Amino acid sequence: MVGLSIVLEMTNNNNNNNNNNNNNNNKNPLSEGVLISPKVVNKANIIVTTAVTTDTTNLRRCYQDSGFLEHCFLCRRKLLPAKDIYMYKGDRAFCSVECRSKQMIMDEEESLRREYCSLMDVKKKKFDSPATAPSRYRRDPRNQAGGFAY
C-alpha cells in the first residue's frame, strides 16, 4: 500500500499546486510544460513519466541537417529509405555489411598502429634516457656531489 499512497500523495500535491497557482496567479516555472502521469506497476513500485513540451520542428530540423543517415560513411553512396542501414559506433551509417566491415577493419588497424607507435616511443625514450644507460657509463653514487666516502 506504500506505493499506492505515494501515487495518491503525488496526485493530491499536483492538484493542490494547481489550485494554489490558480488562486495566487503565480506560476511555478518548473511546472510549466511538464506533464506528470504516475502509473502504479505494483504496490511497491511506481513509474512517473514526464513529458516536456518542446518545439518538435527544431528537433526535426536538427536531425535533417546532420545528414549522417543520408550517405554511407565509407563509400558515400546515398542511403535509400527502403534499404537497410548498417550502423557502427552509433553515428556512422553504412550501405552494406561489407562497407561496415571494411571500416571496422580500418579502425582496428589504426588502433593497432597507434598502440605500436606509442610502444615504440616508450622504448625509444627508455633507451635515450641517461638513467637507463649501461652500467659502465654510470658514475658511482659515492663520487657524485653530495655523496660521502667511507
Curated annotation (Swiss-Prot):
Name of the protein this chain belongs to: FCS-Like Zinc finger 15
Keywords recorded for this protein, A-Z: Cytoplasm, Metal-binding, Zinc, Zinc-finger
Keyword Hydrolase: no
Region described as Disordered: 12-31, 129-150
PROSITE patterns noted in UniProt: ZF_FLZ (PS51795)
Biased composition (Low complexity): 12-28
Functional note: May act as an adapter to facilitate the interaction of SnRK1 complex with effector proteins, conferring tissue- and stimulus-type specific differences in the SnRK1 regulation pathway.
Pfam family of the protein (one): zf-FLZ
